[in-house]
Every structure is written in structure tokens, then in C-alpha cells.
């Protein structure tokens, strides 16, 4: 069960949040690429208490054929929460929230994947929430982005996602569950980042209320967090490439010794 079952008296005490973070700090993040052998690309990611896994298949032929687009690949994205991912057991299958998250996430990736290189094909992205906490959609977007790179899918850059919330009147980066449940606002972002620079906003949603100035501040706070996450995504991919290189060296050395 959650440590906080009822609304806490305060969400920020002496400048610190309930989990000890400052307003501009991310939750702990762990990223591991290429965790599923049968997928073309995959990623396991932890973001706070969120635990998610993403798998990419394709580009591959579309069935049935009448769904094919002769000019470009179609992108299919499925966000799903495992029945055991939340404290109260969830019914299997997609609900309205999962369908909505799948739709906006697909649109974010459609803007960055070079679809025109793969006409009449499909790129399928499956993300499964194994353990849910605040910000599961942002965690899944980050995992899916790494999985796409792992699959070798050409993109204009990385999709990197983080949310900004408002708790006790203070903007906070990467809200925890209590801030998400009892705060005044929640604003998930996804950015297109290329070569360490933010190119554009690929996704922006809003739940709650912020002033115009707060929205501007939230965008800057989200950019700061996204660039940190981008470096973690990049490091996870580089680690995987190094592992592949070492495996190839071992195979080559073994062949020479034979």
C-alpha cells in the first residue's frame, strides 16, 4: 500500500518534497536497452516507482494489406497497464485512459520517425506498465524511444518525456504519486532532442490550472529535466553498443583460435 493513503497536510515542507527532492530534481531513473531477444528493439526503464518495458517490431509488412500506406510506414503504439501494476487489481485490456495515452504517444512518434523510408510497412511499439506510479506515460515514452533506437529505426532525434506538476503552489519536476493525486496541476511533455539540443515539443498535455507565467516556467523546468533524461537514454544505448562490440570481439577471437 502507499505510504500516504490520505492527502498529506503539506506536499512541500521546508523547501523539500515528501520524497526528499528539491523542486527541480528528477526521481531515480534506470534504463537498460535490448532486454528482449525476440523483439527488434526493446528497453526496460524504471522512473521512480514506475517499472515499464517497451518492445519494437518492424519495420515489417502490414497485414491485412488494405491497411498499407504506399507512401510511408504506419506507426502503431499500444500502452497497456498490467493487471498487477496498481494496488487495486486492474481489469485486463485497454480502458479509456490507455487508449488516449496510446493515441497521443503514437502522434508524438509519428512526428520523429522517418516513415517515408518504409512504404507499405508498419512499425509496432508495445509498452507494458509492470508497476505504476505517477508519470507512467512519460516513462513509457522514454522507454519506447530507446527501444526504437535499439531496433535501428531511423528518427529525426530522440523523444524524451517528463512532467511538471504544481504542488502547494510550487512547480515541481517529475511529480511523485502524492503530488499527482493532490496537486493543483500536471503537465506532461515530450521533446524532440537531437545532438543534445531540444528541437521542438512533440507532446504537451495539461490537467489542472496554471497561469501563463507558470506555463512558461513549467516549459523551462521540463526542458531542464528532459536534457538530463536524454543523457541517460544516450548512455543506455551506448552501453548496449559497447556490449555488442565486445561480443563481436569474442566471436572474432574465438574464430581465430579455432
UniProtKB/Swiss-Prot annotation:
Name of this chain's protein: Exosome complex component Rrp41
Gene Ontology annotations for the cellular component aspect, listed alphabetically: cytoplasmic exosome (RNase complex)
Function of the molecule: Catalytic component of the exosome, which is a complex involved in RNA degradation. Has 3'->5' exoribonuclease activity. Can also synthesize heteromeric RNA-tails.
Pfam families per record: RNase_PH, RNase_PH_C
CDD domains: RNase_PH_archRRP41
GO terms, molecular function: 3'-5'-RNA exonuclease activity; RNA binding
Subcellular location, record wording: Cytoplasm
Keywords: Cytoplasm, Exonuclease, Exosome, Hydrolase, Nuclease
Phenotypic consequence of residue 180 to A: Abolishes exoribonuclease activity
Family named by the database record: Belongs to the RNase PH family. Rrp41 subfamily.
Enzyme class (EC, first level): hydrolase
NCBIfam families reported for this sequence: ECX1 (TIGR02065)
Record GO biological process: gene expression; rRNA catabolic process
Superkingdom of this protein's organism: Archaea
Subunit composition and interactions: Component of the archaeal exosome complex. Forms a hexameric ring-like arrangement composed of 3 Rrp41-Rrp42 heterodimers. The hexameric ring associates with a trimer of Rrp4 and/or Csl4 subunits.
Amino acid at each position: 500500500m502507499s505510504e500516504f493513503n490520505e492527502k498529506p497536510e503539506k506536499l512541500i515542507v521546508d523547501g523539500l518534497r515528501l520524497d526528499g527532492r528539491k523542486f527541480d530534481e528528477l526521481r531515480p531513473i534506470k534504463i537498460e536497452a535490448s532486454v528482449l531477444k525476440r523483439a527488434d528493439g526493446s528497453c526496460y526503464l524504471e522512473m521512480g516507482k514506475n517499472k515499464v518495458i517497451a518492445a519494437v517490431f518492424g519495420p515489417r509488412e502490414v497485414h491485412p494489406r488494405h491497411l498499407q500506406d504506399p507512401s510511408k510506414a504506419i506507426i502503431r503504439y499500444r500502452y497497456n497497464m498490467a493487471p498487477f501494476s496498481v494496488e487495486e487489481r486492474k481489469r485486463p485490456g485497454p480502458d479509456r485512459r490507455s487508449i488516449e495515452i496510446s493515441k497521443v504517444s503514437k502522434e508524438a512518434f509519428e512526428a520523429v520517425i522517418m516513415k517515408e523510408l518504409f512504404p507499405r510497412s508498419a512499425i509496432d511499439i508495445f509498452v507494458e506498465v509492470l508497476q505504476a506510479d505517477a508519470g507512467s506515460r512519460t516513462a513509457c515514452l522514454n522507454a519506447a524511444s530507446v527501444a526504437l533506437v535499439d531496433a535501428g529505426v531511423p528518427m529525426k532525434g530522440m523523444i524524451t518525456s517528463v512532467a511538471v506538476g504544481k504542488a502547494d503552489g510550487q512547480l515541481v519536476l517529475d511529480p511523485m504519486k502524492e503530488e499527482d493525486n493532490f496537486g493543483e496541476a500536471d503537465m506532461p511533455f515530450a521533446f524532440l532532442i537531437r545532438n543534445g539540443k531540444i528541437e521542438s515539443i512533440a507532446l504537451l498535455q495539461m490537467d489542472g490550472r496554471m497561469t501563463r507565467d507558470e506555463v512558461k516556467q513549467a516549459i523551462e523546468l521540463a526542458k531542464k529535466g528532459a536534457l538530463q533524461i536524454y543523457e541517460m537514454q544516450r548512455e543506455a544505448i551506448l552501453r548496449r553498443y559497447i556490449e555488442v562490440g565486445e561480443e563481436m570481439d569474442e566471436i572474432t577471437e574465438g574464430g581465430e583460435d579455432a
